Amino acid sequence: MRKIIINGGKQLTGEVAVSGAKNSVVALIPATILADDIVVLDGVPAISDVDSLVDIMETMGAKIKRYGETLEIDPRGVKDIPMPYGKINSLRASYYFYGSLLGRYGQATVGLPGGCDLGPRPIDLHLKAFEAMGASVSYEGDSMRLATNGKPLQGANIYMDTVSVGATINTMIAAAKANGRTVIENAAREPEIIDVATLLNNMGAHIRGAGTDVITIEGVKSLHGTRHQVIPDRIEAGTYIAMAAAIGRGIKVTNVLYEHLESFIAKLDEMGVRMTVEEDSIFVEEQEKLKAVSIKTSPYPGFATDLQQPLTPLLLTAEGNGSLLDTIYEKRVNHVPELARMGANISTLGGKIVYSGPNQLSGAPVKATDLRAGAALVIAGLMAEGRTEITNIEFILRGYSNIIEKLTSLGADIQLVEE
């Protein structure tokens, strides 16, 4: 079993660079299946989700070379083979293979997606879109089969009943080579959607409106190879900014796009966090007295659900009472009892997280229950006096590139150990 050991209470300083966006790259890699030639992705993070996707792609017949943060993907040998379990089951983003395989072959058999257990995720929105485009859906054990019965996908007008990043991206991928025009209404607007649309357009797709709530895709016959730079990970950036405000003595977070973090930065401003926003970086000063705030997550450009948990340890340093309400994923509260184990005055009440501060945390054995809860526990461990042991760390390694090395470079006493 692997665990992370932190000896906390140390002031951190220095500079940390944000890696490429996890929530982009897990869609970009499957999207390359649509290309007729080599696609090169730059800025690919060193996370286990990428390792799993590379393994799956190679199993399907893709040839992949990896040079540091660059992936060179040759999808020409990809075969339409069933992918019922294994790596697929541990990976929520496996559902992007539905769209890419449907777009290339008109059929796909893929294991039901895994990932973090955060409550209902609207996979039905994906299926509704595929069915509108002419695909049928059936189930074979733990797998789902989508097929067009030899006919090409057809463009369609699709209204998303709920704003969903995954369903919006998956529909774009499937529609890129469909016959005719596809219009997605009530589309999600996240930067990662723009990133995937940019890749597809650079491959020859005709996609307009990404980043707005109406996206139009004119299907094309073929897509070619290209080179693409993955956008910076706004969630990783927010995580390090929150950490810097909680325990830093002057930390510069680089490779940041401020416009992707405006609602998050606005809440930090409300708390009284002192920071300087530069062209592609944010310098976070050592903080004094912070004020408790209340937060409600919402789809982009609102406060990101993925930043709710990483921000929680910083909130615990603030004076006063506050609350967190996650309207996107109702089960995103599993970090609360772990933080309480470290001495935090925090609890759940009617689906809402409530807290009082300031708090002095103490090191304790804790368990990461999902990716962002794990990030919260790492920050809490850095803040706490004494030793913190975090288990179930595979969740953390799914989404934070070189996290041990990055924190060590800032002066943290943190290590990954095998037992």
Curated annotation (Swiss-Prot):
Entry coiled-coil feature ranges: none
The enzyme's E.C. designation: 2.5.1.7
Superkingdom, natural source: Bacteria
GO molecular function, one term: UDP-N-acetylglucosamine 1-carboxyvinyltransferase activity
Keywords annotated in UniProt: Cell cycle, Cell division, Cell shape, Cell wall biogenesis/degradation, Cytoplasm, Peptidoglycan synthesis, Pyruvate, Transferase
Main location: cytoplasm
Binding site residues for phosphoenolpyruvate: 22-23
Pathway: Cell wall biogenesis; peptidoglycan biosynthesis
GO cellular component, one term: cytoplasm
Residues recorded with modification 2-(S-cysteinyl)pyruvic acid O-phosphothioketal: 116
Family per record: Belongs to the EPSP synthase family. MurA subfamily.
Annotated function: Cell wall formation. Adds enolpyruvyl to UDP-N-acetylglucosamine.
Protein name: UDP-N-acetylglucosamine 1-carboxyvinyltransferase 1
Source organism of this protein record: Streptococcus agalactiae serotype III (strain NEM316)
Name of the gene encoding the protein in the UniProt record: murA1
